[in-house]
């Protein structure tokens, strides 16, 4: 499943992933710039599904060194919070990948903006 999404941060957006069935792939293709506000974008696992323990996601704060958040056991939500600026790491042409290799468990990967000005956007597991 590839979802082209025009999330801008102007309104909160909640996405529930499909059931984590072996072979399922979900791609979030970001089609717009997330410069419209600071409302969150969340990806929640369905039912009893979880993110793989030890999954990594990059988080950035303006003027600060980027950090990596690591998922703990039984976490089910990935939250992205943009800055109200044109400097977010989730912008035109970036992708979030959710892949299932083991029933009930989502693996996560990402291709975020990497330029010098893409230095905002907080991401965290819960």
PLM regions: where:
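Acidic/polar low-complexity surface segments
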Residues: 68-74
